[in-house]
Amino acid sequence: MLHSPPPFADGLRPLKVIIIGGGIAGLSLANAFEKAPVPIEYVILEARDTIAPQVGAGIALAPSGCRILDQLGVYDDLEQLVHPVQSSGVCDGQGKSLLPERSDTALLVTARMSYPLGWVERRSVLQVLFKHICHKKSVLTSKRMDRIEHSREQEKPIKVICTDGSFYEGDLVVGADGVHSKTRSEMWRVVEQNICDDFDVQQERRAMMAEYQCMFGISSPIPGLDAGMTDDTLARDVSMVVASGKDGKIFWFLFKRMPQVYHSHEIPRFDSADALKFAEQYFDFPVQSGASNIKFSDLWERRETATLVPLEEADFAHWTAGRIVCLGDSAHKMTPHTGTGGMLALEHAAVLANIICRLVAQGNKLPLTTSQIGTALSQYDEKRRHRRTSAKIKSTGASARMQTLQSLADRLVVRFLLPYAGDIRADQFCDDAIGAEHIEYMPVPARSMTGLMPFNPNRGIGMHESIWPRVLWALPLLGMAVAGLLTMFSVAPFEDAYDFLARRRYREVEIRDKFYHSGLLDDFSRSGVLRFIVSEAHFFYQPFSFFADYGVWYGIMLVESARRANRLNVLSFALLWGMLNMWGIAIFVPIYYFAYYILTPISTFDASDRRLTNLSYTKTILPVLLATHYATFMDAYLSPVRSHRQAAGFLWELFPVWLSLAQAGLARKFLQPSTLKQDRLNNVTRDLPTIRTTILGLCAVSTAVWQYTVWCSEDSLVNIFIPILSSAQGQTFEQLFAEFLKWDQVFFAIPNLFWIILLFADLRAAGLIHAGWLKISFSALGLIIAGGNGTMLGLMWLYREEVLATRRDRGAVVRPIA
């Protein structure tokens, strides 16, 4: 019988839905229908004789699905059955750990998304979902579908006929009957008979393939596998995932790559004899690294259930046709490596409920036509949703292949990058979850809006910003780098400089030949020493102001190098950027900005903890920068003893090296243990006071030098800072050297401003700020007038930092501000 909702005062005609399959997707959809604000009748036809059979499978509950379960009012019951994952380990086929220590990355997922990762029996999820259904008589077991009758007549209902001869009529059929979906086959038949829609059915039939087989099971507790632990074992062509749930119950999956890739009807099936033979091959396969010495044989001996299946993968291009719609594994199938499949089925059940609710709310009094239903269902079968689903299928497939070390790249990543990957697995889980769907006609749970990474339908897997528009926007920075290179080196008096260095004398000043007593280091540094000698004698103010501004940039670069979001990219290599700039600030600062803009779109900071920096290093920035950059720079210009000036010049030329060594020493000796691991979970703004002090301190120095230049120089600012655009012919060595440094500063200052424009454009696009470009421009101009280019750079960047720490993207689902 169909569940009939109570009559609605507005006389809306109820929509009749036949759900094939009483699994997680089908039961969730039924729960959503019962809570709809419009009349929706439904019946669930389940082929098995019980609604919650023991098939020996565990399911990972992840935030994307938990929010929907919370909306349905079932999550509290499920949470009692779950022990949240608290620690994770990864080892190789010999039992050697691939991580420096067990990871708490699952706790970070909880802190970000407000729902923990946890494992539970699939049967328990079904039992809880069924428990919350009010009209249980609408859930029928032992009802195996035989066929679907879909009429060409627009207003005729669709009919489902079961193998026992019973039949059911409704407005549409939802196929939630799994990977071997009879509904999907019937939908293809209807299309082939030209009853509705038109797409390439043969291509759809070829979409399914299987490259892996999986033995999954449940075992009773084993000492050493405590509740809340997960362990992965990675080896060539075989891998294993083991998770310990409530009361120590163990859920496990043993994956193996099959000899070939099978397609569609070629995909093999396995029986109990195959399962036993398969298991015996891997009795010695390690489960966990360390002294526990737990092997697969221990799981096998304590098994409660064990099943061997092929792992189908399919990305079907069409989920609907006429009055038929596929849901869950019947529409898309992926490997279980990331626990995505079940959660995606919940999401799509929510989407389908939203669409059907809107369809009924339109107030149709007459029976809905096939065209009307098809038009509504096209919102479900849309490009955006396919893109996100396809991305998840590819992601889980890539995970399966990496865990079995399928390619050379996979083996290199596991061997060399995985130990340093930090929270990359949390990033992957959260990227899967952040863009999750929800039930639109039910309140969003308050719990889901309190995490460090709010849900956002515009973010996440399948919704990532394309890199190419960012490349195009940032291309002018590369143009500036090239222009700086060509312009500076067109005026640089290299021959005269080499001559002075070779003679070890500039005019009447002797140039020190050795300082480090290393030919490589001394030769590298002497040219810079010449810069200080020449500029101090002939054009003091411009380089003095320039290198004060450069200190602000260097401080920002050091903060960015300590940022969690930049842990695995080139921005973390502060020493590299520092030494490159010694070959030309105007060349490599724009390149740094280009890399930064490409690598850190605004979505990088959707999780507040990714903005966080390692405070052990951030605390050292101001003192070590003052000691290694500013002190040596000031001494090289202002010391009354000429020999001290040259010594300071030698030291300054390698200040990035001394700075890096000082940072490492201070961080390890005086600022340990690092609080980063705790801060990322519960104190993500802990570094802000230190960052403020650092940048404001550097800006104060830059402003003081700028004001000193403005008020103490007898020359005009134009003559001090603006290079001559005419030919360099006929100019003296000193004049050419001055022009060289002026161009160096010009092609440092312009990229600074352009980078700030790009960063603020990101803030505006995300709705993080609402100021217009006129206000932003006048703010930047005012800062330049008051404190110079370096102060503008530092304070505008610091404002952005405050915004990133305290505001949310316009699409974020958060509690409204009272």
From Swiss-Prot:
Main location per the UniProt record: membrane
Molecular function GO terms recorded: FAD binding; monooxygenase activity
This protein's UniProt keywords: FAD, Flavoprotein, Glycoprotein, Membrane, Oxidoreductase, Transmembrane, Transmembrane helix
Membrane topology summary: Multi-pass membrane protein
Subcellular location: Membrane
Binding site for FAD: 46, 60, 122, 329, 342
Function of the molecule: Highly reducing polyketide synthase; part of the gene cluster that mediates the biosynthesis of annullatin D, an alkylated aromatic polyketide with a fused dihydrobenzofuran lactone ring system that exhibits potent agonistic activities toward the cannabinoid receptors. AnuJ does not seem to play a role within the pathway.
Family: Belongs to the paxM FAD-dependent monooxygenase family.
Protein name as it appears in the record: FAD-dependent monooxygenase anuJ
